[in-house]
Amino acid sequence: MRLLDLCSGSGSLSRVARSRGWETLTLDIDPRTRPDLLADIREFDPSEHGDWDWVHASPPCNYYSIACTGCPRDFERGDELSLAALRILEYYSERGENPATGFLKVRPHMVAHRNRMETLDLCKYGAPWRK
């Protein structure tokens, strides 16, 4: 199996996939996360990266988090990133990820995709949190 992990952040999903023998490619713009491909998701061309069995995208949740009560929300930037992720997800497999309690799923460009959303409990796969 092959996993393309967009906005991979901590890489917890990819670590689990690799531990089960999957080939993974992580993409993130933050060099501190040490992704396989250091790139901006908005500039990622899926046609240059082959086929993947599963594509996971987790744009930064701070733009949509309900837990972020003291910080300013930048829905415009968050929407840019989630639209880029959606473009790539649609190219491959039309699957996506968003924390179950976040605002991303109610943004206008995501409403049409809500019937395909499911909850993934990463804590069941070795991560210290649920998404």
Cite the ranges covered by each PLM segment:
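Extreme N-terminal starter segment of soluble prokaryotic enzymes
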Residues: 1-3
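Conserved SAM-binding motif I beta-strand of class I
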Residues: 5, 23-28
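Glycine-rich SAM-binding Motif I of class I
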Residues: 11
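Conserved dinucleotide-binding and phosphotransfer motif residues
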Residues: 20
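Aromatic pocket-lining residues of Rossmann-like dinucleotide-binding sites
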Residues: 17
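Class I S-adenosyl-L-methionine
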Residues: 6-7, 34, 38, 42-54, ...
